[in-house]
A protein has these predicted regions:
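DPxDG-like acidic metal-binding loop motif
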Residues: 115-137
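C-terminal nucleotide
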Residues: 1-15, 19-20, 28-29, 34-93, ...
Length: 217
């Protein structure tokens, strides 16, 4: 059966990670780990989403009047993501489909923990690209993915990771920007290396701590 695959890269914030929340610029680079979403039509009357990497498994659902009606009980991360995409991005079709979301490259091969390289944003962008109603247009994908991201984050976060996953490369970004981010050239002779600490971080809690510090200052 014919299928289509869509991928989006992870990211690493080089500077401005929390200052960007207050309107300062951030510099972010796309990485070669990618989230992949594969879509294929189903002859059955229900859709199914399968995940590889995060919360591995398969769960059935239907799209009714633009909303997800779950027939199984997926993990909250899977449920909230698909719900947010269906509620905030115009869907290309409500016909039954099989979705496979693969984020395996965002997890440590040693202890299976998340590496903190933007898997959630990369998955959001790839899923929006796979399901949105418009033709494959990067700016419409960005606009819809930002809406999904805001819904998932309760309006918090800068959106720099969404922008990086959409446009790739090395970018300079401000959270107040409505135009696409500025592409930046990597300096000649400058090299970088990332190291995995072995400890996961909660992005939402980190944003809340940063907000608390800025209020005190």
């Amino acid at each position: 059966m014919k299928s289509s695959s869509f991928t989006a890269p992870g990211k690493a914030l080089l500077c401005g990670e929390y200052a960007v929340l207050r309107g300062a610029p951030a510099v972010c680079v796309a990485l070669n780990c990618r989230a992949q979403v594969t879509v294929s039509k189903r002859t059955e009357r229900v859709s199914i989403v399968s995940t590889v990497g995060f919360a591995e498994g398969s769960w059935r659902f239907k799209i009714i009047d633009g909303s997800v009606a779950w027939l199984d009980r997926p993990p909250e991360g899977v449920k909230s993501l698909l719900d947010a995409v269906c509620n905030n991005a115009p869907l290309t079709s409500c016909r039954p489909a099989a979705l496979t979301i693969d984020t395996l490259t965002f997890f440590s091969p040693i202890d299976k923990k998340k590496l903190g390289l933007g898997s959630s944003s990369a998955t959001t962008v790839a899923l929006v690209a796979a399901l949105q109603k418009q033709s494959f247009d990067i700016e419409s994908i960005w606009a819809n993915a930002k809406m999904v991201h805001k819904a998932l984050q309760d309006g918090r976060g800068s959106g720099v990771d969404i922008a990086t996953s959409c446009f790739g490369g090395l970018i300079t970004y401000k959270s107040c920007d409505t135009a696409p981010p500025t592409k930046t050239t990597w300096p000649t002779g400058l090299y970088y290396q990332f190291f995995y600490s072995g400890t996961e971080a909660d992005t939402t809690k980190a944003i809340d701590r940063a907000a608390g510090v800025s209020k005190k200052s």
